């Protein structure tokens, strides 16, 4: 599996090529050869490929039957918490987290998002030559932008500590990718290898930083000294409220360890998802200049040269269509998995316990039977009447998942993306650099393997 991926991704592909065979070559080969309802053995585990939207809906709606597989211990060094909890533990955690992600709370985060976006576009302006244009690999800047947004919105005034967490998480991702194959060797995690020691050391440092932030914030909240609008403050407030409403029962609320894991999840999911969405959006708009012009015209019509506001962002129809289409073509994750632990009926198939179900987001999003002959082409017009009318068969579009376990941070990611796109369009025209190489690669999330090199022109 790994060798086929490395061989396929050793060079770039054409911008108009099907990315599925490049990004996930092994699964693409299996589905092409054996069909959309095929299965393979991954060691002792039978893995069923799922591409039928009705089955996908049934699996994601019935979360008490179709469970998330127990996370690989390497992945759990990076993220845990809500992403992997099940049953009552998940329901309690989601209830405590929900208030922090409602639209009213997100609206109050807009100034922090604006500051992060402003810093990056100002930096780009200083990099552009006096002639009015320069080549820039925008990918690292967009990664910094998204990390900065999460630092500010998650930790508020403590965002410098948040930046340190981002640096550590970035290092951890690289180590996890380098050691992903070794993790299948029984007992490997207990060996005192250099990488194992380093990963555990990074995890300890991240936890120590977050624990210190939490302790300081809890102390101030209990003393009534501050009421914050960042995610950590709202999470702690919601947790205190949950404990008080339960009559201070011992098992009410969530533990400090759970709060730490949620903060780590904020970082990984928030930063990776949005930075890659912005990078692919710039690549698509640089390639399809007519859509770039339509989006810019809309942005100037709504905001002029003024600072984007919450109400205006909600009126950006063309920008929303573009982001939806980018998420269709380049979803943040290419697949989600579920597992059954008892005999289960799915459609007309009865499955034994222990089957893993792979729900292929990229393949479904690119399926010509669902989306038409232009399924692999960039055409935001398909979303002109909203997501529901973009495709004939429901549940064929799920970049953030479906059902009760849909991504809790999707609204934050969307608001951040709209703000960044609007501010970039206000200040720059951009096109692909001749040095741009197209290589959609999965490194936990789908990202441009060779960067995103653009020629930026000041407006």
What kind of feature is each model-predicted range?
Residues 237, 429, 445-459:
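C-terminal helix/juxtamembrane-tail motif
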Residues 274-286, 420:
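Short, small-residue alpha-helix embedded
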Residues 289-292, 410-447:
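Cytochrome P450 heme-binding "Cys pocket" and the immediately downstream C-terminal segment
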């Amino acid at each position: 599996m790994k060798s086929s991926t490395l061989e396929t991704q050793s060079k770039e592909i054409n911008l108009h090529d099907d990315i599925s065979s490049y990004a996930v070559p092994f699964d693409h080969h299996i589905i092409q050869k054996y069909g959309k309802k095929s299965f393979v053995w991954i060691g002792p585990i039978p893995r069923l490929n799922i591409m039928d939207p009705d089955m996908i809906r049934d699996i994601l709606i019935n979360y008490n039957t179709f469970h998330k597989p127990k996370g690989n211990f390497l992945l759990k060094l990076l993220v845990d918490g809500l992403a992997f909890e099940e049953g009552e533990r998940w329901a309690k955690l989601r209830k405590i987290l929900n208030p922090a992600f409602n639209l009213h709370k997100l609206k109050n985060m807009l100034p922090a998002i604006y500051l992060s976006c402003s810093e990056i576009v100002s930096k780009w302006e200083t990099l552009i030559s006096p002639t009015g244009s320069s080549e820039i690999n925008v990918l690292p800047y967009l990664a910094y932008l998204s990390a900065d947004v999460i630092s500010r919105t998650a930790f508020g005034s403590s965002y410098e500590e948040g930046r340190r967490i981002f640096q550590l998480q970035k290092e951890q991702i690289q180590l996890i990718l380098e050691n992903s194959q070794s993790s299948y060797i029984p007992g490997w995690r207990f060996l005192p290898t250099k990488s194992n020691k380093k990963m555990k050391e990074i995890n300890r440092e991240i936890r120590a930083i977050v624990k210190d932030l939490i302790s300081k914030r809890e102390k101030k909240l209990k003393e009534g000294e501050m009421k914050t609008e960042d995610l950590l403050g709202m999470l702690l407030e919601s947790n205190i409220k949950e404990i008080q409403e339960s009559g201070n029962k011992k098992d009410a609320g969530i533990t400090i360890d759970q709060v730490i894991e949620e903060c780590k999840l904020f970082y990984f999911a928030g930063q990776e998802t949005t930075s890659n969405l912005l990078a692919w959006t710039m690549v698509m708009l640089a390639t399809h200049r007519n859509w770039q012009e339509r989006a810019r015209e809309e942005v100037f019509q709504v905001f002029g040269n003024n600072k984007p506001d919450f109400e205006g962002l909600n009126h950006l129809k063309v920008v929303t269509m573009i982001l939806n289409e980018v998420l269709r073509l380049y979803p943040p994750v290419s697949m989600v998995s579920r597992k059954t632990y008892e005999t289960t009926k799915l459609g007309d198939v009865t499955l034994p316990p222990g089957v893993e179900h792979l729900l292929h987001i990229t393949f479904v999003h690119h399926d010509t039977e669902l989306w038409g002959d232009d399924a692999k082409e960039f055409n935001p017009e398909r979303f002109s009447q909203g997501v529901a009318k973009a495709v004939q068969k429901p549940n064929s579009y799920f970049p953030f998942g479906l059902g009760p376990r849909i991504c809790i941070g999707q609204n934050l990611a969307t608001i951040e993306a709209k703000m960044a796109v609007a501010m970039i369009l206000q200040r720059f025209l951009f096109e692909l650099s001749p040095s741009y190489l197209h290589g959609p690669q999965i490194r936990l999330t789908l990202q441009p393997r060779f960067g995103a090199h653009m020629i930026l022109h000041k407006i």
